[in-house]
């Protein structure tokens, strides 16, 4: 496989819902438009799929508002992006995380990762939020020895902060970063 694309948590609650990331709708629309040009051989989409009483939720002593409850509207993939994914001809895999009631999970790749990534020459990484789940996914993929293959799509990875935390991890892990516009230049 030449190119894999990982899209982290492009869900309604992180865009227009209970835990919105500034610039997320524009970033996910930009990504949806760029998907055909990205020409990925396989796409992996991670998704928060929390139980109703998840430990990360404020009413249960956590730090986050209730978000991405499995099967809720807020857990759905951003519609323009979902439509663009459906139009692709490559395989698409959805990876749920945060499913355990008493365990928060900021990365879908803590313990394992899709073995298809080993054969990828390039792994593009983007999604929401840049300073939380994209950052932790990057750290875990790098820990699994995949850093040399990773390129972070910075304009498709908006953060709850000003982007500083993600940029710091990009530097630490020595992965590449690029905007969608400059991807194949």
Locate predicted features.
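Acidic/histidine-rich helix-loop elements
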Residues: 15-23
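Active-site loop/turn elements of alpha/beta-hydrolase fold enzymes
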Residues: 48
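Glycine-rich loop at the start of a catalytic domain that most often binds anionic cofactors/ligands
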Residues: 57-61
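Active-site-adjacent betaalpha module
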Residues: 2-6, 13, 26-42, 51-53, ...
């Amino acid at each position: 496989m030449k190119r894999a694309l990982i899209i982290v948590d492009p869900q309604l609650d992180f865009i227009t819902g209970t835990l919105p990331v500034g610039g997320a709708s524009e970033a996910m629309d930009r990504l949806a438009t760029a998907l055909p040009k990205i020409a990925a051989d396989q796409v992996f989409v991670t998704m928060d799929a929390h139980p109703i009483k998840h430990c990360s939720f404020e009413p249960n002593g956590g730090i986050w508002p209730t978000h991405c409850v499995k099967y809720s509207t807020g857990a759905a993939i951003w519609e323009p992006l979902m439509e663009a994914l459906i139009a692709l001809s490559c395989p698409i895999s959805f990876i749920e995380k945060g499913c355990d009631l008493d365990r928060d999970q900021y990365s879908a790749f803590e313990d394992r990762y899709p073995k298809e990534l080993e054969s990828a020459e390039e792994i593009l990484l983007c999604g929401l939020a840049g300073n939380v789940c994209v950052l932790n996914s990057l750290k875990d993929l790098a820990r699994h020895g995949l850093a040399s293959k990773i390129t972070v799509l910075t304009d498709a990875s908006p953060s709850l902060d000003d982007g500083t935390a993600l940029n710091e991890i990009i530097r630490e892990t020595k992965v590449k970063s690029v905007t969608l516009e400059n991807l194949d230049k």
